[in-house]
């Protein structure tokens, strides 16, 4: 049961690549053969791990080969290998290299921003719930967090967030699409909000799930960085590129801000992670394959939830947020009993559950578990 309508047109966003027909989509899927059961056996875990919004098909074969071909340089520190990746990302985003901050996953980017701007009493405005690594880390260094509840439709309350900005506000945090709700802010609303807020403070836009957006021509807020606005954007290689275990991400910010963030990095990213990220950016076929498989898996989740009459949010990500109509702790235990691991609770929405997309085998495992629970 869909909570609100969603467009499923133009499901594939690509830079320089579009899949023009269904036959081409099938060709892409057929030409890339990767293990279907990898996630079920990882670390000896027998569960279908649908809890962390990972890409079960990654990394691509080209990335795997690049990693193996560069094993000989693992004995060297990675300083001399950064420049090529920085340039590749800068070209991808359409900015100069001094706008880019390499981070160990987008999580490090979130944390160093929280440290840099939330230090000793800085105020941060954020939606609630959201992916809160930045806020949690900033609190450890004395930041004051103002949480603005999402609306009844689980959207960012941009009006409420704007009203909370004052002279002590050091950062406004936006997650778009939002984790865990999967909702997407209308492009014009987001641009207007960011422009207005950036006149008063720094705006951070977490775009970890940006690649999954299907709305035609939906803009990245990197465009505002290019205009010189006080905006920081985070991106990750952990989702569509399938590199979660290598911890690769980056920030895009104006050079003056980027320099301050670089000074607060805990360490530098590893050589093989940089090699993998550089190759992943150029592998458009795997990018398309991953988006196609995510679309198929998400539709399978929708069908399962619809058949059971469960309310869910149409998602612009690689997960679906739904109401199981049961106490979440007990529900998660029931799922695990039948071989499926779902996401953690997301207070204050403790009557909602987040399930990640997976392989079709895992989606069938999820459906079977749900039928056992609700049958």
Annotate each language-model stretch with its function:
Residues 1-30:
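N-terminal export signals
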Residues 150-152, 295, 307-338, 357:
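Conserved PLP-binding catalytic core of the aspartate aminotransferase-like
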Residues 19-76:
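N-terminal "arm"/small-domain region of PLP-dependent enzymes with the aminotransferase-like
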């Amino acid at each position: 049961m869909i909570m609100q309508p969603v467009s499923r047109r133009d499901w594939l966003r690509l830079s320089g690549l579009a899949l023009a027909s269904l036959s081409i989509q099938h060709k892409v899927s057929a030409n890339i053969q990767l293990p279907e059961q990898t996630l079920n056996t990882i670390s000896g875990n027998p569960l279908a791990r649908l809890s962390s919004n990972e890409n079960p098909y990654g990394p691509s074969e080209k990335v795997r080969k690049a990693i193996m071909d560069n094993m000989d340089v693992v004995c060297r520190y990675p300083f001399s290998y950064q420049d090529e990746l920085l340039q590749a990302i800068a070209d991808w985003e359409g900015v100069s290299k001094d706008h880019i901050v390499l981070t160990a996953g987008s999580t490090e980017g979130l944390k160093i921003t929280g440290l840099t701007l939330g230090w000793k009493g800085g105020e941060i405005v954020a939606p609630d719930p959201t992916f809160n690594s930045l806020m949690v880390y900033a609190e450890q260094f004395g930041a004051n967090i103002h949480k603005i509840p999402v609306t009844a439709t689980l959207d960012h309350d941009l009006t409420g967030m704007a009203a909370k900005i004052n002279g002590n506000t050091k950062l406004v945090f936006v997650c778009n699409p939002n984790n865990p709700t999967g909702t997407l802010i209308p492009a014009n609303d987001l641009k207007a909000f960011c422009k207005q807020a950036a006149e008063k403070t720094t705006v951070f836009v977490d775009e970890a799930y940006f690649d999954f957006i299907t709305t035609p021509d939906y803009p990245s807020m990197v465009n505002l960085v290019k205009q010189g606005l006080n905006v920081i954007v985070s991106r990750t290689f952990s989702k569509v590129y399938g590199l979660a275990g290598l911890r690769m991400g980056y920030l895009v910010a104006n050079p003056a801000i980027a320099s301050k963030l670089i000074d607060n990095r805990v360490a530098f990213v590893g050589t093989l992670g940089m090699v993998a990220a550089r190759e992943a950016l150029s592998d458009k076929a795997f990018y398309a394959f991953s988006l196609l498989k995510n679309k198929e898996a998400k539709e399978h989740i929708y069908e399962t939830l619809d058949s059971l009459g469960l309310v869910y949010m149409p998602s612009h990500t690689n997960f679906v947020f739904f109401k199981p109509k049961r106490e979440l702790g007990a529900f998660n235990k029931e799922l695990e009993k039948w071989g499926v691991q779902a996401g953690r609770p997301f207070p204050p929405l403790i009557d909602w559950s987040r399930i990640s997309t997976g392989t079709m085998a895992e989606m069938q495992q999820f459906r079977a578990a749900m039928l056992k629970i609700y049958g």
